[in-house]
């Protein structure tokens, strides 16, 4: 449990609870996602503290790309989970996240790279990801700017795309609040003191 004495806070302009079960520090997309997932798991005593306003750190200028193709199968599965989650938070929060599914292609200019893409595809299929090995000519139909003569193959991910990181963060925040989470903005944490019992 958090005790008020264990955090030094500055800029506190709102009445805040003095004890809580968990505190998330930082109101970017990751912090708001953590708060959302805690409330989704049933944590009703969870608080997020943001030193300024939500998304005021690096989230507001993030690219917002969505990808499932990754060399690490665990990361690929996490990326797939997150893409599926976006619809959920949009529905719960009522916040449009500006999601655009465009599809994406990874190209192989060498046989070695193409073999690597085949391995990534096989791992992805095992994890339930819907990717497809395609020819350079098929890739050109999707991306007319490429010259198929320079490539030996490609990997297509139909659900790749992009979204608005600002709106996505607010969707997480609104969904978390609807599930009992609390968010305090303009609260700077300047010190943490760990109790001997942890």
List the predicted regions and their residue ranges:
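A short, basic/flexible loop-to-alpha-helix module at the beginning of a structural domain
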Residues: 6-20
